[in-house]
Amino acid sequence: VESDWSSASYFFSIAALSNSATLTLSTFFKDSLQGDSKLVDIYKIFGIETKFEEDHIILRKNKIDLPKSINLNLKDSPDLAQTIIITCLGLGVDCTLNGLHTLKIKETDRLIALKNEIEKFNVDKVEITKNSITLENNSDLKHEVIIETYNDHRMAMSFAPLSLLVPIIINDPEVVSKSYVNFWKDLESLGFNILKINR
């Protein structure tokens, strides 16, 4: 049984936001039927090379010149939107993501949630329509932003890789258990420093 490509997306983001990275992810196949497998092509934009082995993939970060902006239609893989826009936020790449009308009817209205949380980082602009989101970056990310997760597992997991660049605080981190119980343990195994805050 193939693993879930949308769960793999957070590790593509980690690789993209790292100075250098080689990550191995188990049970992914080249001829996947999952729409979210288009991650492989999308993350080439950010310098991530994906090598397919017999039953796993190896992600490698290559140094490349990043584009100033990207425009993607994600109508067949809308669950990747949160991860991709946070990758763009971290890399300083402006982006417009289209085909996102279904994100308004997920665990939360993900477009509004993304706009609310990304704006906390002092970006120049975040605009949403009924099926798109546009980000215009600023050069300096604000530190120790508190991320609300809106009872949405993907909000917690998509913002987590940003902690490679700036310290962040994620409220209700247990929400990841909806789809990926060991997410925080897996990040710790990669060297992430995760502290529980009693507030």
What are these regions (language model features)?
Residues 1-199:
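Short, structured segments at the rim of ligand-binding sites
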